[in-house]
Amino acid sequence: VKEYPINICLINSGFTLGSKIDRDHFFNILTEKYGMYANYEPDSYPGINLKYYWNELTQQNPDVRGRCVCNEYCEGTGVGCGDGQCRRVSIMIFQSGQVIITGCCSIEKLEYIHEFIKTIHKNEYLTNN
């Protein structure tokens, strides 16, 4: 029997925030307060499409966490560690409170991003809505 190395390259997940979401308000929190790259056009897609740029170099800095601040050209298709090496993760947030995360390459990163969204929802959205 020949053994083949296994490399996890894509993990998708879904969860609920437990309440309905005012997408305009949540979108404004994500883009204005956190400076995140997100798109929300309800005429073409029913959810907020958030891009989280994972990079070990910025994870400990809350001012830039989730954003690409690379000096080198970066497409978001890197390994997630180093200048120009961000790993782009897509997060879709719907009015129902359902959230879909796609593009993670490890359970640890998935759990971190899951907590990141839940914390913004709890600390920013629920307290100011």
Where are these regions (language model features)?
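Extended intrinsically disordered, low-complexity coil regions enriched in Ser, Thr, Gly, Ala
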Residues: V1, T102-N129
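Intrinsic, low-complexity N-terminal interaction/targeting segments
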Residues: V1-I93
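Conserved beta-strand elements of beta-rich interaction domains across eukaryotes
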Residues: K20-D22, Q98-V99, C105-E108
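Short, structured motif recognition centered on aromatic/hydrophobic residues
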Residues: S90-I93, Q98-G103, I117
